[in-house]
Amino acid sequence: MSSRESASRRPDPLRVTIMQSPSAFSLTIGGHGVATSDYLPVLNPATRQPIGQCPVASEEHVEQARAAAGDAFAVWRQVPYGKRCEQLQALAGILEAHLDELAQLLTHEQGKPLADARGELAGAIAFCQCAGSLPLPEVVHEQSATRLSKTVREPLGVVVAIVPWNYPVSIAFVKPDRRVGCRKHADSQAGADHAADYLRIGELIRDALPAGVINVLAGNDDLGPWLTGHADVAKISFTGSSVTGRHVARSAAADLKRLTLELGGNDAAVVMADSLSDAVVERVFWSAFTNAGQICMATKRLYIHESIYEAFRDKLVAYAQNVVIGDGSQPGVTMGPLQNAKQFAKVMSLIDAVRQRGGRLIECGQMRGGDGYFLPITFVDLPDESAPEVVEEAFGPLLPLLKFRDVDEVIERVNAARTGWLAASGVVIGRSAHGLQQPSTRSVWSTTGCDHAVYSFGGMKASGYGAESGLEGLLEFTTQKTVIIQQQ
């Protein structure tokens, strides 16, 4: 079978070979491992074979976790802030000590190449270290011999953190763990497809923090509503699709819970006329196709200046032809499969729509995949601005290539998206100041990326609200308290 035939073949989601006795993971509630009566298989997307069994939490488990978190909060909030930071730093040490094991498990359950899995673990470690070193701001308004007034920050209480399948480990640790958390590791669509690594981390950190400070749950579609609708939850931090985010927001509104939503994006990169270089081509390529394009802040629309369009496109295609697509655990593979059958079907439907209307598809890459959810790197050459692959977030290895003439025009087209995550610009920084801050997005990058844990990020418009990471992300998990003391 040719690589092209292999790339175009749709895997049958019903044809799954069951391995002998895959290991079962357990929930973490109140510092203890908890088994369940029901389990779902965790599939390796490169082979579609089980690598383990995911426990399915019941409503009773949710109540147990909520009670454990509430009891822990009463004690944990009294621990000095500096001591809490030290314990968070200790989590980074645990991740470092088990990095190889966790990276291999992450590759097997998520699909990304092993080097990228190690990078995700390194990111989680950096987030722990960063959050464990951030000072909580305290503002003194008035201080005299007779009067003191100040504003301090205190932890909110029990938090539900909902983690997605594309970066389940790093995003889990973006959500500051120094606050008491009822941590849920399950997507409201299919929690079993990404729970293994974080369930394993839950097992590793049970003795690192007081019982109940972090509880790790996984399950099916029922788990999300049970957690987000619970009256004793003070805050929800959700990372996932805009569609599910709206459901979470409605659930939070019933009790006026604090809410952070990090949702989908249809991010654009802009390549100016002075950027026809191999370095820019490589940078733009990986901004779109890292993790097979399954990143909220990945480039999903590429605007290229008309004067270099054909030359830049051809360089991009030539670079893509050398990318090896296959099982991320194998040497030499630099791009893995789609993570699950649902996402595979979504991207295939967008590609099929281009074919049906007679659009030009350019398929690239060296396919070494088997029965997994593999797709070739696919460019759409000059689609209409209203085409589905331009308007919708593909969240896969599909990238529309578009022309533009001037900066004002392209900024208007970038801003036409309903989402507002990121705008990236492949231009020389010294010549890009004009217009750089005009995109209606929460982040703008110019020939660089978000490469430090201290930076905060988030969305606007349909990409959500609130902040993750950095000081701004930390403050999302706190509430202000103004203290006024009249001294005698």
From Swiss-Prot:
Q: What class of enzyme is it?
A: oxidoreductase
What EC number is given for this enzyme?
Answer: 1.2.1.3
Q: Which GO terms describe its molecular function?
A: aldehyde dehydrogenase (NAD+) activity
Q: Which Pfam families match?
A: Aldedh
**Highest taxon, organism lineage:** Bacteria
Q: Which InterPro entries match?
A: Ald_DH/histidinol_DH (IPR016161), Ald_DH_C (IPR016163), Ald_DH_CS_CYS (IPR016160), Ald_DH_CS_GLU (IPR029510), Ald_DH_N (IPR016162), Aldehyde_DH_dom (IPR015590)
Query: What is the purpose of this protein?
Result: Involved in an alpha-terpineol oxidation system.
Q: Which PANTHER family match?
A: ALDEHYDE DEHYDROGENASE-RELATED (PTHR11699)
Identify its protein family: Belongs to the aldehyde dehydrogenase family.
Q: What is this protein called?
A: Probable aldehyde dehydrogenase
The organism is Pseudomonas sp
Q: Which gene encodes it?
A: terPE
